[in-house]
């Protein structure tokens, strides 16, 4: 089994004083050796973190002691290397940004469907299957016959619904996303818009891949994830995609062989949209990345304080050596 445990979690719960959780949560993550990002808002908690099994267990145990944060929904997957550089706890207005006031999954939400029952539901010809994720996620994998809203961000999803879905015409709507959190809001939104029978995949794609055998699966392709793995396969192991550091789009090995791909600077998805000023900035950033690698440091998204400490330690050792030599 891989050494690094990746834990995606969320819970919609009213956290009246969520700001006060930021500092102690950051401290618990750092002392446990957990990296990744967690978002806190009045509506709850969301994020993905990684560490050893004991580190993740410690974090989940601590969260369970906090009012309202017991029974957090989480999914585990594994990686051979740490997929995050930093430890961050951020304060937000929403833990998943739809931008529609009054949508509260704690009050109204669609019907949860277990992974084992999902195939039967989406095989029903009367069910409209909608992928709630962004276009760059859908392009590398989705469920058979699912509709692609072609949204750039989740904020665009309500407009897609208004323009393309009709409660009178679409009697049964099933939706899915990576870990389940976006569907909490998307199904709540549809219910508010008058849709009656609204379903969503409990635990999201990740839970489906974990519980449904490959030979029985209706999933096609890989699943995009928001960490350095870029995507995972049906075994929840790192997939075949890399990521363009300029536009963050997933890219294949064949796409990296094209003239449009320059490491850290451009790929076929963004080369025509990058200004000369941006290109020069990306070139300089990539140069710094390569220099950092030569020094044994991380650069993009790295823990800056750790890098500074490493450099200071090197300087201190050099000064001491020079002092000892002159003494």
UniProtKB/Swiss-Prot annotation:
**GO MF term set:** oxidoreductase activity, acting on paired donors, with incorporation or reduction of molecular oxygen
Q: Which residues form a coiled coil?
A: none
| Entry's EC annotation | 1.14.-.-
Query: Which reactions is this enzyme annotated as catalysing?
Result: uridine(34) in tRNA + AH2 + O2 = 5-hydroxyuridine(34) in tRNA + A + H2O
What keywords are annotated for this sequence in UniProt? Oxidoreductase, tRNA processing
Domain of life the protein comes from? Bacteria
Q: Which residues form the active site?
A: 177 (cysteine persulfide intermediate)
Q: What sequence ranges are listed for the domain Rhodanese?
A: 123-217
User: What general EC class does the enzyme of this chain belong to?
Assistant: oxidoreductase
**Annotated GO biological process:** tRNA modification
InterPro entries membership: Rhodanese-like_dom (IPR001763), Rhodanese-like_dom_sf (IPR036873), TrhO (IPR020936), TRHO_N (IPR040503)
UniProt keyword Signal present: no
Alphabetized SUPFAM superfamilies for the sequence:
Rhodanese/Cell cycle control phosphatase
Which protein family is it in? Belongs to the TrhO family.
Q: What does this protein do?
A: Catalyzes oxygen-dependent 5-hydroxyuridine (ho5U) modification at position 34 in tRNAs.
Protein name stated in the entry: tRNA uridine(34) hydroxylase
């Amino acid at each position: 089994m891989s050494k690094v445990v990746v834990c995606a979690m969320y819970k919609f719960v009213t956290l009246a004083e969520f700001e006060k959780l930021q500092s102690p949560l950051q401290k618990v993550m750092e002392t446990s050796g957990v990296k990744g990002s967690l978002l806190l808002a009045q509506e709850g908690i969301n994020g993905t973190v990684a560490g050893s099994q004991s580190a993740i267990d410690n974090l989940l145990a601590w969260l369970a002691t906090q009012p309202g944060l017991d029974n957090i929904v989480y999914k585990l997957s594994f990686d051979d290397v740490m997929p995050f550089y930093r430890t961050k706890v951020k304060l937000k207005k929403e833990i998943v940004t739809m931008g529609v006031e009054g949508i509260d999954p704690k009050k109204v939400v669609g019907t949860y469907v277990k992974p084992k029952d999902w195939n039967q539901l989406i095989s029903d010809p009367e069910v409209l299957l909608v992928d709630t994720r962004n276009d760059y996620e859908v392009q590398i994998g989705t469920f058979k016959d699912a509709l692609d809203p072609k949204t750039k961000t989740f904020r665009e999803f309500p407009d897609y619904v208004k323009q393309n879905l009709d409660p009178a015409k679409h009697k049964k709507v099933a939706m899915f996303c990576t870990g389940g959190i976006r569907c909490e809001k998307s199904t709540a939104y549809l219910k508010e818009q008058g849709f009656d029978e609204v379903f969503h995949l409990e635990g999201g794609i990740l839970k489906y891949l974990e519980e449904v055998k490959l030979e029985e699966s209706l999933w096609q392709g890989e699943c995009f994830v928001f960490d350095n793995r870029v995507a995972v396969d049906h075994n929840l192991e790192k997939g075949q995609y890399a990521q363009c550091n300029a536009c963050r789009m997933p890219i294949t090995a064949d796409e990296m062989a094209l003239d449009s791909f320059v490491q850290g600077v451009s790929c076929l998805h963004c080369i025509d949209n990058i200004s000369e000023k941006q290109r020069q900035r990306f070139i300089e950033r990539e140069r710094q990345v390569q220099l950092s690698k030569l020094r044994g440091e991380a650069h993009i998204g790295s823990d800056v304080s750790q890098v500074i400490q490493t450099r200071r330690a090197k300087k201190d050792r050099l000064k001491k050596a020079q002092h000892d030599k002159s003494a």
